[in-house]
């Protein structure tokens, strides 16, 4: 999470947040990171009056980007080792595990056992979900994406979102709306390179029909909120480098 004198940014992983962070740190001198992937409910009261910015991504695309970002880089971390069953599961199996997080109590218990009781959000590359936080997914039937969305943002009606597929335009629109845009910021946003990308083919090529349908079930609330759909590669640009 980054706080400025104009707004607060809550960073949802794999949604273009590194790009947004770079813009904020470059153009807002008062900006400071107060916790890496810090949930909004932990926002200090002195910043509670500020507008909150977040970012979202098509859930089908999120799981592909997330998998190819954390594996094999974070193969030994608690979440990744749990997702991949110690490296024995590849994308389909790992994603199925993530989607069934709120329905498979035995596997949920195994993951909770690996997580800390408390999180020091000043640290990076550590488990940033507590045992108590993850307990809340039990019996909900939602997938990992929806769990993280709810955990980070809480009441999403109180948050302005940049959609990853139109990140630059949405970011400029938000900054204009709060009176924090300038010609220099607009030019920088439009001309800067992507950040923290994961190398993969179009997301649809990784899914079986059954797995794609499971995403639509487990992450239905977010999908319907933002109007996301599953697009085959033939109807979308084959982007090999997505943030």
Please provide the spans of the model-predicted regions.
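Membrane-interface amphipathic segments in extracytoplasmic regions
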Residues: 1-243
């Amino acid at each position: 999470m980054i706080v400025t004198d104009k707004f607060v940014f809550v960073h949802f992983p794999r949604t273009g947040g590194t790009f947004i962070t770079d813009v904020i740190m470059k153009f807002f001198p008062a900006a400071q990171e107060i916790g890496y992937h810090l949930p909004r409910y932990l926002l200090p009261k002195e910043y509670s009056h500020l507008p909150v910015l977040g970012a979202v991504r098509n859930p089908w695309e999120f799981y592909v980007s997330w998998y190819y970002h954390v594996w094999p880089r974070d193969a030994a971390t608690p979440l990744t080792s749990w997702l991949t069953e110690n490296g024995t599961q590849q994308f389909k199996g790992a994603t199925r595990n993530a989607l069934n997080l709120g329905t498979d109590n035995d596997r949920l218990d195994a993951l909770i056992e690996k997580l800390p009781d408390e999180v020091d959000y000043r640290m990076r590359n550590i488990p940033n979900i507590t045992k108590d936080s993850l307990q809340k997914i039990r019996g909900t039937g939602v997938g990992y994406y929806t769990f993280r969305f709810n955990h980070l943002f809480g009441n999403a009606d109180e948050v302005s979102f940049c959609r990853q597929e139109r990140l630059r335009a949405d970011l400029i629109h938000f900054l204009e709306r709060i009176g924090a845009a300038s010609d220099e910021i607009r030019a920088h946003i439009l001309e800067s390179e992507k950040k923290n990308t994961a190398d993969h083919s179009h997301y649809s090529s990784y899914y079986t029909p059954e797995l794609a349908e499971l995403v639509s079930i487990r992450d239905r609330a977010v999908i319907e909120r933002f109007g996301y759909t599953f697009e085959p590669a033939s109807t979308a640009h084959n982007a090999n480098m997505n943030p």
